Amino acid sequence: MQYAPFASDIELPFYTSLASHKINHDKLDDSARPVLGLYEIRPSDPEAASCRIQIHGNALTSSEAEGMIKNVNTVEEYRNMDRPHLLHQAGQMIWDAIHDGTILSCPSLLCSFVIVSFADLKKYKFHYWFAFPAIHSDPQWVPVQPTDQVSQSHQDHDIDNLKGSHLSPHESTALVEAVQTWSYIVDHRQRGFFLARKSRLRPDASSGDPQTKSAQQDTSNSNWQIASLSEYENGFFKNVADEDCYFCFSDPSNYEQAPGWMLRNLLVLIKQRWGIERVQLIRYRDVHAKRDQGRSTVIRLESSPKQEPQTPKSLQTRESLPLPKVTGWERNSTGKLAGRIVNLTEYMDPKRLADQSVDLNLKLIKWRISPTLDLEKIKHTKCLLLGAGTLGSYVSRNLLGWGVKKITFVDNGTVSFSNPVRQPLFNFQDCLNGGARKAHRASEALTEIYPGVETTGHALSVPMAGHPIVDERVTRADFDRLQTLIDGHDAIFLLMDTRESRWLPTVMGKAAGKIVMNAALGFDSFVVMRHGITEDEKPAELGCYFCNDVVAPANSTKDQTLDQQCTVTRPGVAPIASALLVELFVSLLQHPKGAGAPAPIARNTERDDHPLGAVPHQIRGFLSNFENLSVTGKSYPSCSACSDKVVSAYREQGWDFVRRALNEHGYVEELSGLKEVHEKAEEALADIDWDEASDNEEIEIL
């Protein structure tokens, strides 16, 4: 007796689902999980392509699945897996279910399967090997000849018995209708195996021809009763002639002489549980749309024709029986007993592949190091970068590394020939023909690096304190665009060259309650900081970039020599500062209080409770001695940028406030209270008495 083995047929979405479960849920857990496999009767399939177990994209979501998948963590585990033991376990499960009777409540266990897999998620290669456990019968089942079959050669006899006898169109139609009706009222795991009982009706008395009566009795004057396998033990075949009793299974095999693989386990059930050694089976292969074609066949098998029929064994005896030999590992496409490999990069959209690859390294952080890391919060934070030069280039690349999907550039400069070596978003071609706009080219470069990022560039000049307005219409338009951009983003990065260019975005960010991140460079030093936000319950908030100043920002570009006009700094300072700025930003997002996270009171070498540790206020770095200092600075009540008076004036007056701040010298100092601070300092200085002595005497300050 030959059987058509199952062949695995995996849909591409399943691999994506498996990868998602591994990254987001299973992580390092390689425990076996249920997987749903389906097979169906498909008359149109060629013989070699029939008898397939289909694994759909949602196969991992079903709790009622008889398949198991063990997705291991390394390729070495996959290669060194104890496969004989795994197959033995799968066969033992079927064997035990047959003996304890649970197989009757879930017959689909007879066609259970196991998958061993390894998902190489960096290269998107999936290694897998299916096993369809089949318990051997000893002695084997062989086809038997019906008692009314005419004499013929032994070889022809075997071939015909393997093919079986087809049902007539009337019988087939009646059987399909009965099976369809029964399948509506039973669990889907019952439908693959069932009992069928033929009821023969009395022939029509009006027909006088005995041969006609006999034909009607065999075909049209018969109907079918269908029941689950469990009904065998409730007397479903009681007082029914043997030739009218059938054990049935849905057979996806289109081979005429080779029934499907699941029959092997069904025969073990029939013999081991019920002691039956001669059985009549129906290979149910019809579909409702073609129910009159009669593809279903009846086959008759015998287990031990030379022995007396055995009686069913007692439960205790059955449970003590050893498991027979189990086979079932699938052969690969070359016919060898080996696993298969599928390379998903051949089928995936490159952009989709890039999306998943970008997420992979980040999600791996959650496996061991930081399980509570909120990657979605980082991903959906919209970042506005004011400055697309050295700092802007490095900051944007680091934000991409953290999975930020929306990055907007603002810069009014063009790419010069000195830029590409220090600014990684630009190249030599960008310097030609007067130079490309930095904001636009930076946006294009990010898209070339990672097409999944949503990025735009805006060429505009940020109005600067100390720089009087030349064309109010243009400056007002730039202000309005900047205000729209700030309102549409969650975080603002101040990455410009001059101090005064950071003033207005600081005021606007504070007024809008946005996260404001700032980085500034010296020759061998830098400062990286986050601006504080207003919190009602914490009046002593953190300061901003201008809180240590006692004067308002002024024009710092006036009368500068060449070395002052260019950003003269050690080349490594910008990458270091940019990396620290982005890491500080991400740590801030992960803190339970977000932008309101307090600065650590004292230096603590241990990680805090939240995912990425402490969130300092400022980091000041010095490459002269390679030292970083975490500094905390409180807000200054008379700050020219973040004080309540300045922020309130901006909220109330908007553009009018900005126009006065740019055009009227001393307006910001007077509004913020810095002018009063200067006056009090001068008064205090005037009150100091100086005791003048001779040149040989020390000056004593009273």
UniProtKB/Swiss-Prot annotation:
Segments of skewed composition (Polar residues): 208-222, 304-319
Keywords: Autophagy, Cytoplasm, Protein transport, Transport, Ubl conjugation pathway
Subcellular location: Cytoplasm; Preautophagosomal structure
Renumbered residue ranges of the record's region Disordered: 143-167, 201-222, 295-319
One GO location term (cellular component): phagophore assembly site
Gene3D superfamilies with a match to the protein in the record: NAD(P)-binding Rossmann-like Domain (3.40.50.720), Ubiquitin-like modifier-activating enzyme ATG7 C-terminal domain (3.40.140.100), Ubiquitin-like modifier-activating enzyme ATG7 N-terminal domain (3.40.140.70)
Residues that span the membrane, as ranges: none
Record CDD domains: Apg7
Catalytic site: 566 (glycyl thioester intermediate)
Chain span(s) of sequence motif GXGXXG motif: 387-392
Compositionally biased spans, kind Basic and acidic residues: 154-163
Gene Ontology biological process: autophagosome assembly; autophagy of mitochondrion; cellular response to nitrogen starvation; piecemeal microautophagy of the nucleus; protein modification by small protein conjugation; protein transport
Annotated InterPro entries: Atg7, Atg7_N, Atg7_N_1, Atg7_N_2, ThiF/MoeB/HesA, ThiF_NAD_FAD-bd, Ubiquitin-activating_enz
Listed GO MF terms: Atg12 activating enzyme activity; Atg8 activating enzyme activity
Pfam families: ATG7_N, ThiF
Record remark: domains: The GxGxxG motif is important for the function, possibly through binding with ATP.
Record-linked NCBIfam families: E1_like_apg7
Quaternary organization: Homodimer.
Function of the protein: E1-like activating enzyme involved in the 2 ubiquitin-like systems required for cytoplasm to vacuole transport (Cvt) and autophagy. Activates atg12 for its conjugation with atg5 and atg8 for its conjugation with phosphatidylethanolamine. Both systems are needed for the atg8 association to Cvt vesicles and autophagosomes membranes. Autophagy is essential for maintenance of amino acid levels and protein synthesis under nitrogen starvation.
PANTHER family, per the entry: UBIQUITIN-ACTIVATING ENZYME E1, UBIQUITIN-LIKE MODIFIER-ACTIVATING ENZYME ATG7
Protein name: Ubiquitin-like modifier-activating enzyme atg7
Organism: Penicillium rubens (strain ATCC 28089 / DSM 1075 / NRRL 1951 / Wisconsin 54-1255)
